[in-house]
Amino acid sequence: MKILVLHGPNLNMLGTREPEIYGSLTLDDINAALSQLALDLGIEIECFQTNSEGRLVDRIQSAAGLFDGILINPAAYTHTSIAIRDAIAAAALPAVEVHLSNIHNREKFRTKSYIAPMAIGQICGFGADSYLLGLRAIFNHIKK
């Protein structure tokens, strides 16, 4: 089993960007924890971060046939990107949407997700653990 892990805009700034909201772990820390969990589960992951909406769409489109599922934190694109939503729908792979913070308990403009209707589930509000819970969720879903 191989899972594509996608990190959206500004996640490269984790550890220094608003740690009171997003925590003190860096993206490298999160990727290392995901890699360890993947090893424990006996699966492969490939992690990719970009600040570009188009590059995220390209990676999602190229995932079909190469990956069994997608774990995605679309970050700010959650609330704006119909293009990412449509790419996930077209890829026809199971996807889990994750967020470090609880997007439903933040500013009103952050509460709507264009991605969630295309995902098998959404996990948010657990900091870096949202990613680990998301990886376990997609693993269990595909394994069924």
From Swiss-Prot:
Concerning Pfam families, the annotation shows: DHquinase_II
The Gene Ontology biological process annotation of the record reads: amino acid biosynthetic process; aromatic amino acid family biosynthetic process; chorismate biosynthetic process; quinate catabolic process
Enzyme Commission numbers on file = 4.2.1.10
Q: Which reaction is recorded as catalysed by this protein?
A: 3-dehydroquinate = 3-dehydroshikimate + H2O
Q: What class of enzyme is it?
A: lyase
Q: Which GO terms describe its molecular function?
A: 3-dehydroquinate dehydratase activity
Q: What SUPFAM superfamilies does UniProt report for this protein, alphabetically?
A: Type II 3-dehydroquinate dehydratase
**InterPro entries with a match to the protein in the record:** DHquinase_II, DHquinase_II_CS, DHquinase_II_sf
Gene3D superfamilies given in the database record: Dehydroquinase, class II (3.40.50.9100)
Instruction: Indicate whether Coiled coil appears among the record's keywords.
Output: no
What the entry lists under PROSITE patterns is as follows: DEHYDROQUINASE_II (PS01029)
Annotated substrate binding lies at 73, 79, 86, 100-101, 110
Q: Which domain of life is it from?
A: Bacteria
| Site entry: Transition state stabilizer | 17
Q: What pathway is this protein a component of? A: Metabolic intermediate biosynthesis; chorismate biosynthesis; chorismate from D-erythrose 4-phosphate and phosphoenolpyruvate: step 3/7
Q: Active-site positions, per UniProt? A: 22, 99
Keyword Lyase tagged: yes
Keywords annotated in UniProt = Amino-acid biosynthesis, Aromatic amino acid biosynthesis, Lyase
Q: What start-end ranges are recorded for coiled-coil regions in this protein?
A: none
Q: How does it assemble?
A: Homododecamer.
General function of this protein: Catalyzes a trans-dehydration via an enolate intermediate.
Q: Which NCBIfam families match?
A: aroQ, PRK05395.1-1, PRK05395.1-2, PRK05395.1-3, PRK05395.1-4
Give the PANTHER family listed for this entry: CATABOLIC 3-DEHYDROQUINASE
What protein family does this chain belong to?
Belongs to the type-II 3-dehydroquinase family.
Q: What is this protein called?
A: 3-dehydroquinate dehydratase
Species name? Geotalea daltonii (strain DSM 22248 / JCM 15807 / FRC-32)
